Amino acid sequence: MTAGIDPVIRPIDRLSICTVLDSAGATEDERRADTEMKFGVLRDLIGLSDAALTKQLGVLETHGYVRRVREYGSTRAKDKVWVSLTASGHRALRAHLAALRQIADTVHEI
């Protein structure tokens, strides 16, 4: 596979999650305070079910690319889950997107 293509981010749903979090500024960054996105907002922007988004976030979290924080409410239905792209996830996304651009540029040159 092409150098820089990240097998964790490659599936379209995970790529979408990472790019939405990055575009919204929901990233851990040493230059500013962490910013997070509500699970429900992310779900609505990407168009996945709760279960599908939870599964994909689990894979990304296992690899250290996203962080989830649960804010407990008085009932489980009132819990809030916040999601952010980690610094490691941000670097992986940047490398992945650069590799995709390189592929696109190579194809364009042919």
Where are the predicted features?
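Amphipathic alpha-helical dimerization/coiled-coil segments
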Residues: 1-12, 19-23, 88-110
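N-terminal helix-turn-helix DNA-binding core of bacterial DNA-binding proteins
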Residues: 2-52, 62-65, 73, 80
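Short, hydrophobic-biased segments on the C-terminal half of alpha helices
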Residues: 54-58
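N-terminal processing/targeting junctions
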Residues: 59-62, 93
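Short beta-strand "wing" residues that participate in macromolecule-binding interfaces
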Residues: 68
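Basic, amphipathic "hinge/linker" alpha-helix immediately C-terminal to the N-terminal HTH DNA-binding motif
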Residues: 73-96
